[in-house]
Each structure stands twice: as C-alpha cells, then as structure tokens.
Amino acid sequence: LKSMDLHEYGKLQHQLAVDLDRNINIQWQKHAYPLIASFTYSVKEIEYMARVIDRTGGGKNTVVVISLGQHFRPFPIDVFIRRALNVHKAIQRLLMRSPDTMVIIKTENIREMHSDAERLSDFHGYIQNLVMMDIFQDLNVSIIDAWDITIAYGTNNVHPPQYVVGNQINIFLNYIC
C-alpha cells in the first residue's frame, strides 16, 4: 500500500492508502462533531458518517467499518442515540442499493479511569455499547467487540497497546477474508 498525501492540516487528517495493482483503496476519516481532541485539526473536512455512507457505492469488494463511542461520552445519551440511528438508516440505504457490501461495527475500547472520570468513564461507554448493540441488531453487519477485548486484556487505555489492536485487526481480517 502506498500512502497518499492529501495536503490536509492537522493530526486528524483524512488518510488514504492505495495499491493500484491489487485494486485496494483504504480510507480513514474523522467523524463530525462531537470531536474531542487536545490538538488542532481542520474543520473544513468534517462530515457526518451518514453522509459519507450515503456517498459510498458499495459492492462485493467494499468493506465499511464504523466506530462510534468515545467522543460522545461527555454528552447526553440522546446525542449518541440520534447519531447511531442516523448511521443505522444510512447503512440500511447502503445495503438496499448494494446488498453485497460488508459493514463492520467496531465497538469502543474501555479507557483509563484517572482522566475526567465523571464525564468520560466506562459507565457512559457501557450504556453506549448496549444502545449500539440494540440499534444495529436488525442489520446484516459484523461486530468487532473491542469492548470485550479490551476488558479481557485489562488495558484500561482508550488507545490500547499494539498487541490488543492487532487482535482487533485479526478479527477484521477474519471477516473480510
């Protein structure tokens, strides 16, 4: 894969890697608000996930991976529910126009308990995790249960160590291969 420079500003810039010989195109982009970060980032590229999904053509060689969670913790649960429902509807539309598209939902990681526990604790994450499982249960999507994986490893880190992320990636690869 060759990483492409998209000439965007900040740490959370859109990422693109391609392999033209194998027809592989991997993209990553930050989600829209709420977006909590301790560094600067450009707001001009921010898009809601539902809009990005609606623009995705889909097909048997297309995999869409979505993760909702951490940045919603400090906000009322209805903000998270509304966003998850909008993503659910967008996935429904994607699967109607292109049923061979694979959609994978990655749950959030547990996190450390010493950083602003009142607003960011796993209590809020657990509720969001339950809500997400309920909202997406009727769709033909696969789940990477990062919540259970990070509990099993006892990492207590919003950005778990490489070996934990590696196991999450292995589950992803098992779904698509």
Enumerate the predicted regions with their spans:
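Extracellular glycan-modifying ectodomains
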Residues: 1-177
